[in-house]
C-alpha cells in the first residue's frame, strides 16, 4: 500500500476524498526537498536524527505521488479544445472521475506537478495527459487563474498558447462585483481583475513571461524554452535561475544570438 492524505479536496472544487492528487503532490515534494537538503547539508546540519531520517526515507518510498491518468470519455463533447474522446488526462481525484467537477473551473490544483513543481517533465505519458488536462480546462478564466495558466503552458513548452492566454489576461475589464467563472483581465491602472482586483494575476503574468524566456529545473538552465512566435526578436536581462545564476539573453529570428550566464555562487555550471 501507499501513504495518502485523508479527507482532502481539490481546492474549491469537487468532492472530499482520501489521497487527493493536489495534496499528494505537495507532500511528496516536501519529502523530496527534505531529502535533497539532507544530501547537500547533512542530517546533523538539518537537525535530523539518524532514526528520524530512516523513517523519512521509509515514508518517502511509500507516498502516493498523486500522479495517475484517466481517459476522457466524451462526457462534455466528442472533442473539447482539441481533446478527443479516448485521450488521457491527469486525474484530479484519486477515486472520482473528472465529471465530479466543473468543466472550465478556475482552479487546476492537480497541475502543481507541472508548475511550480517539476514532477512530470521526464514522463511523456504524464506530460501529455497534463497538457490534455489544460486544454480541457480552457483558457479564459479569472485573472489570477490566467496568470497561473500562462506559467503552466510555458512549462509545457508551448509559448504560443502561453502568449494567447497572456493576451486574454491583458484585456481591459471594467466592472463591479465578483465573477468566479471568467471575465478576468486588467483595469486601467493595470491592476489584475479577478474580478475584483487580485495581485496574484499581476505576479502570475510576469512570472509567466519569465518562464517563457528562461527555465531552470533538474539542474539545467533552458534558454528561450517557450518563446512565442510573435516575439521574433528581443532582449532580456537579469533573469534569476536556480542556483543563483543570473541570465541575460538577446535573440533574433527566434534564436539566441547572445547569452550571458553569471555564476553568483561559484556553483558548477555545465
Could you tell me what each predicted segment is?
Residues 8, 53-61, 224-231:
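A glycine-rich phosphate-binding loop feature that marks nucleotide/adenosyl-phosphate handling sites
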Residues 11-14, 158-159, 172, 230-232, ...:
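Flexible loop/turn segments at secondary-structure boundaries
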Residues 244-269:
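Carbohydrate-binding surface patches
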Residues 20-220:
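Active-site core of glycosidic bond-cleaving carbohydrate-active enzymes
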Residues 1-22:
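Aromatic- and carboxylate-enriched substrate-binding clefts and catalytic-loop regions
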Residues 2, 18, 104-106, 213-214, ...:
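A general structural signal for short secondary-structure junctions and capping/turn motifs
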Residues 3-5, 221-223, 255-263:
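Short, well-ordered strand-loop elements centered on a beta-strand within folded domains, enriched
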Residues 186-187, 217-248:
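Glycan-recognition and catalytic regions of carbohydrate-active enzymes
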